Amino acid sequence: MYSEETQRKLIEKTREFLNLDIKSIDRKKAESIIEDLREVIRFHDWRYYVLAQPVISDYEYDKLFKLLKDIESKYPDLITPDSPTQRVPSEITKVFPQVKHLTPMLSLDNSYNEADLRDFDRRVRELTGLEKIEYAVEPKFDGAGISLIYEKDLFKRGATRGDGEVGEDITNNLKVIKSIPLSAKFSSYGIDKVEIRGEVLIRKDIFKRINEQRLEEGLPLFANPRNAAAGSIRLQDPKEVAKRGLEAFVYQITYAEKDGKNLLGTVLKKHSDNIKMLHLLGFKTPYEVLKVCNGIDEVIDYCREWERKRDNYPYEIDGMVIKVNDISLYEKLGFTSHHPRWAIAYKFKARQATTKIIDVVFQVGRTGAITPVAKLQPVEIGGVIVSSVSLFNEDFIREKDIRIGDTVLVERAGDVIPYVVMVIKEARTGNEKPIEFPKNCPSCGSPLVKPLGEAVYRCININCPAQVIERIIHFASKDAMDIKGLSEATVKKFYKLGLLKSIPDIYRLDFRIIKNIQGFGEKSVNNLKQAIEESKNRPLYRLIYGLGIRYVGEVTAKTLASAVNCLEDLKNFTITDLMKLPDIGDKVATEIYNFFHNEQNLKMIQQLKELGVNVCNPKEEKRGKLAGLNFVFTGALKCCSREKAKEIVESLGGNVLDTVSKKVHYLVVGEEPGSKLQKAQKIPTIKIINEEEFLKMIGQQ
């Protein structure tokens, strides 16, 4: 979208604008700079929301945005419809009017195996008379379908799929999704009016965080990212939509005109070229992962590759879409009443299955929340055996009318925990039993309480054995202090033996005793000892997350860590101070404040400090051996997860990027690499290394 020279100039402009003050800007100055300021903000939106490679801090971005708002407030006649300030409308939408799509949003025909794909290819070759077909193959995003219309370069209307002919006008809600440009230079391609198809998505990690938050707040959970996205784009208040972390990928131009003349198949000849054009115009597209395949054999190979690596992709995909790449053939191939004949979806192995609820048990979480867990007849879903599923809370059970003995539809999508989608009430025999909630804690026997406004019953005994165990498990978990060897089973065993009664006890473990416990040899004891020692030097945000403060996930933990020098500093923050930090509201601030004003918690922090656990941020940034170097990973690594590799690179001063470009210094190639390898091979400045070379580079075995 922006050349390297243009980006350099925009970064220079950024510095100029950051030094401006609204008081020094008169009418003439405002008129001369306002469009450049808007373009600078659009550029930083593109870097952040499309490339995920910001070049300024959040504080600097906010300063630029405030300057633009101040200028427009001072001179309101200078406001334009595509100004970045116009993304969040102030009005509430009570009714979404119905609007007709320029072209129908048809479904795709589905295929489930190689034979189906070969049959599709045969039909296409017969209808076109060609011996071999060029196909464009891309992931099938599992989100909420949308249609966008741009006229004279401005975003005019956005709609839901609806029944395919008519959808709901959700323009205001789509404007707050920053990966949807408010303006795009279609005119530079000779296009006056264009209709684009896309999908609104929620990244898997953001979806997980949303559901964790909703669970804590006693709100109904979303079954999967698709449901969350579909529900979010139909919220009445665009400000609430903006909080959901939505993204939009566009994947098809369905209509394009110049002076009333249709350009598809004439000027716009290939689907892959159209995706490249949308990518260059600043849209989020499957450009990086779209592959042009010469014949059906290449298509099948690419589909198999993606089925193997689907769980490593940050978004939910439920298959691949195969399209004839030559748009001029579309008219000859035509449509059925249901789907186009020039495209087909290859569906991955199902992530849903029906099974029976055998029993329900009640578990106690680290904050005392009582969670009902259904024990299932084991069933395979997406290659994994599922034998239990959380029922979350009493409201969830009542809402779905779940009973012991019921046949239920269970979904497991990627990293998302298994979820009961629905009860198959038609399968009931009359022998099903209602689920009765306990009155007392199943661990310590204390009476349970249900706080006002919450859906969750809680045990308020802070010394409840189950809570203590869960707090220790959470502290040692991968996303917190990452103490390998201190598994859930090990924590429970050590607690039962009296070796672990609190989090600080981890750093007081007597390894002479552990050596004599069945199942612990010298090697496993030494590994555990080393893992515990290494955990003392984790980044501060991991320690904050590991403390298990209610409502504080990884993102909030990072926010808190960046606001202080040392952990103890948080006890000096008032609730008002905490609410000034990004994404921390009243409820979260109150929990944080209460935690750091609890004597027992402060005593625990002091003990951790005395035991050698790092409770401060580094005093100064060390220039690591990878300082200034940009890395991209492709394929699966044997040594560690992609997230761990990223953490190592960043700890040594390097950066990990999502996409291949001239800015990349190293591409690290693991098993079954994707299309990034082919792209990197075309850029001579990128050094391509294997996993072994990468490990030598970072000095690790």
From Swiss-Prot:
NAD(+) binds at residues 58-62, 107-108, 138, 161, 199, 323, 347. It catalyses: NAD(+) + (deoxyribonucleotide)n-3'-hydroxyl + 5'-phospho-(deoxyribonucleotide)m = (deoxyribonucleotide)n+m + AMP + beta-nicotinamide D-nucleotide. InterPro entries: BRCT_dom (IPR001357), BRCT_dom_sf (IPR036420), DisA/LigA_HHH (IPR041663), DNA_ligase (IPR001679), DNA_ligase_AS (IPR018239), DNA_ligase_CS (IPR033136), DNAligase_adenylation (IPR013839), DNAligase_N (IPR013840). Keywords: DNA damage, DNA repair, DNA replication, Ligase, Magnesium, Manganese, Metal-binding, NAD, Zinc. Pfam families: BRCT, DNA_ligase_aden, DNA_ligase_OB, DNA_ligase_ZBD, HHH_2, HHH_5, Nlig-Ia. Residues 621-701 form the BRCT domain. One of its GO terms (cellular component) is cytosol. Gene3D superfamilies: 5' to 3' exonuclease, C-terminal subdomain (1.10.150.20), 6.20.10.30, BRCT domain (3.40.50.10190), DNA ligase/mRNA capping enzyme (3.30.470.30), Helix hairpin bin (1.10.287.610), Nucleic acid-binding proteins (2.40.50.140). Its EC number is 6.5.1.2. It comes from the Bacteria. Zn(2+) binds at residues 441, 444, 459, 464. One of its GO terms (biological process) is DNA repair. GO terms for molecular function: DNA binding; DNA ligase (NAD+) activity; metal ion binding. Belongs to the NAD-dependent DNA ligase family. LigA subfamily. DNA ligase that catalyzes the formation of phosphodiester linkages between 5'-phosphoryl and 3'-hydroxyl groups in double-stranded DNA using NAD as a coenzyme and as the energy source for the reaction. It is essential for DNA replication and repair of damaged DNA. This is DNA ligase. It comes from Sulfurihydrogenibium azorense (strain DSM 15241 / OCM 825 / Az-Fu1).
